[in-house]
Structures are given as C-alpha cells and as structure tokens.
Swiss-Prot record:
GO terms for molecular function: electron transfer activity; heme binding; iron ion binding. It comes from Agrobacterium fabrum (strain C58 / ATCC 33970). GO terms for cellular component: periplasmic space. Binds 1 heme c group covalently per subunit. The keyword Membrane does not apply. One of its GO terms (biological process) is electron transport chain. Low-spin monoheme cytochrome c. Gene3D superfamilies: Cytochrome c/b562. Residues 1-24 form the signal peptide. This is Cytochrome c-556. InterPro entries: Cyt_c/b562 (IPR010980), Cyt_c_II (IPR002321), Cyt_c_prime (IPR012127), Cyt_c_prime_subgr (IPR015984).
Length: 146
C-alpha cells in the first residue's frame, strides 16, 4: 500500500510539473504572438510614414488599435514561471512595476494617437516617432540581445 501511495504521489507531482511547463510555454507563445502583432502594426505604419504605401485612415486606425490593445494586455502575459524560452530578459520580473509602466505608456500614447488620428503621411510619421520610442525604451531594457 505504501509503495502504491508513493508511486501515485510521484506521478501526480510529475504531472503538476509538466502542466506548469506547458502553461509557461503557452504564455511565451501568446506574448510572442502579441508582440508580432505589434511589430506588424508598426511595420504598416512605417510603410505609410515613408510613403511606401498610400495613406489609409482605416489601416492606420487598425494598426494603432492593435498596438493599444496589445500594450494594455501585455504585462499579464509575463506570469512568474514563464521566465525562460523567449527573448524576455529576467529584468522584467525583477522590475515588474517599471515594465508595466512602460507597457502602459505605449497603450496611453496609442490611445492619444487614436483620439487624434493622423490625417496624412506626416501625421503617421509623427505618431511613429512617439510609438517607436516607447517600443525602443522597453526593448532596450527588457529584451535579451540576439
């Protein structure tokens, strides 16, 4: 009986450990997906700001909306236990309040752009400077160098 109990306990413990690893991997994939969406949105805005694509108010609004939405949800994708397996620096978890503040600033700045949506290429370029600076500040501190 004692041996069965030890075996069952060991199996349950192993299952919990595996479930935790799967959960963390899911969080990494989710946040990487969100970051790719932000990157794609920034790319779309950059193409308009450089004149590579014509100004399209709907495309600008969609891109900035994605940035705003993802920036606000982003900190929730970094639970304790998801520190490995991505380009996320350990500094995120060491300075989580600052990380959250940087994400919030990106969200707030994106909301400001949405409230005063650019009406031309120059306006998109101005918005890109602000949003790009927010991205760069966070990446410089909280993204591992490749």
């Amino acid at each position: 009986m004692c041996m069965k109990l030890k075996t069952i306990t060991a199996a349950m413990l192993f299952g919990c450990l595996c479930a935790g690893a799967v959960y963390a991997a899911g969080e990494v994939e989710k946040r990487e997906g969100m970051m790719k969406q932000i990157g794609g949105s920034m790319g779309a805005l950059a193409a308009i700001s450089k004149g590579e694509k014509p100004f399209d108010a709907a495309a600008v609004k969609a891109a900035v909306t994605t940035i705003s939405t993802n920036a606000k949800a982003f900190p929730d994708q970094f639970p304790v236990g998801s520190e490995t397996g991505s380009a996320a620096a350990p500094a995120i978890w060491e300075n989580f309040d600052d990380f959250k503040a940087k994400a919030a600033k990106l969200g707030t700045d994106a909301d400001a752009v949405l409230a005063n949506l650019p009406t031309d290429q120059a306006g998109v370029a101005t918005a890109m400077k602000t949003l790009g600076a927010d991205c760069g500040t966070c990446h410089q501190t909280y993204r591992l160098k490749k």
